Amino acid sequence: MATVLIVGKPNVGKSTLFNKLVRKRKAIVEDEEGVTRDPVQDTVEWYGKTFRLVDTCGVFDNPQDVISKKMKEVTLNMIREADLVLFVVDGKNGITKEDESLADFLRKSGVDVILVANKTENQRRFEREIKPELYRLGFGDPIPVSAEHSINLDTLMEKIIQKLEEKGLDLETKPEITEAIKIAIVGRPNVGKSTLFNAILNKERALVSPIPGTTRDPVDDEVFIDGKKYIFVDTAGLRRKSRIEPKTVERYSTYRVVESIERADVAVIVLDATQGITRQDQRIAGLVERKGKASVVVFNKWDLVEHREKRYDEFTKLFREKLYFVDYSPLIFTSADKGWGVEKIIDAINLAYSSYTTKVPSSALNSALQKVLAFTNLPRGLKIFFGLQVDIKPPTFLFFVNNTEKIKEPQKVFLRRLIREYVFPFEGSPIFLKFKKSR
């Protein structure tokens, strides 16, 4: 794990900064010099990125007692081994000989340094009186913050992540992935959902164990295929014939679809190939996408389509046009009655789930972003600085921009396409985007 060290002379607010960045009070904060005797460390997680943060004792220029000398020795050794150092100075009162002495050591050590000016609540005075003298330390532009009042800490975190990733360090938080894939087979009435479910079980020679439902949860089936566990949700709804009056069937089936989709990881969207794609099919597919679920699209009853051998391209085009919002989904042609193509469904589910739980390195994302932006005209006044993946299930990306109001649907389409074409295809999975204003 990457290690970031907070260093500085006593009483510049290192421990307060540490506590704010780790979001808990772990380092003792007092107004007396030398309160922090031993290094304190904790893990910082920020938008899916993780690193170790260490708060060191204040470095005295000329320590007088044995303990202070030992503290300084420990801190200087830790600096040599750190991946990045946050050099904290007093942005209210300016720098001293102690700061200059520590700056000299940091430059000679060759460690990467971010200069942090703390206590800059009076921003105007800082810019006018203090900031110019900080350039003497030799670390470029300082980042002004107020740890006590949590001012500008996001900017500092962005810089930390950027610096660490430039060094090629792995900051990704390892995702926790559930043991079994939860699958919902969804579609409008009479498209062959039940037949398809049973065909999967028969074709895959699956071992099935009903999981009893409660008053709130429908019955599920735990299915083992090639030693791998899958949970098909609401299989009771797939097995029993409807006892509901015809005029309420659509309303009831829509309710069941919503419930099943919410509980699933992957939705298998079943279409009737003899009827094409209807408005209700589009609504169901749209619901899957909005709920952030992975998906596989199945044209069932393919055996009943005339001249089917010559019509794969026609139906693929129909799928791309009418279900364009889930066109990342694997498309399969089946006949549940005859068992055609059924064996491909589990493979497609595995592919979609793998995409759904994939996390890509920020270095790959930002490398692609910079290359594509070099020949892309963004709306006037919009700048995209960098991005990172902050979640899975579904894959969610956060982009830092100068103006979030400039982000419209075309920019979202552009970024999703960039991710799929240049970073990772995420076949079968939606991609969610978030935006945050940054300077």
Curated annotation (Swiss-Prot):
Residues engaged in binding GTP 2: 187-194, 234-238, 300-303
GO biological process: ribosome biogenesis
Domain EngA-type G: 2-168, 181-357
Domain KH-like, residue spans: 358-439
Coiled coil (residue ranges): none
Keyword field: GTP-binding, Nucleotide-binding, Repeat, Ribosome biogenesis
Family under the similarity heading: Belongs to the TRAFAC class TrmE-Era-EngA-EngB-Septin-like GTPase superfamily. EngA (Der) GTPase family.
Record text on subunit structure and interactions: Associates with the 50S ribosomal subunit.
Protein name, UniProt field: GTPase Der
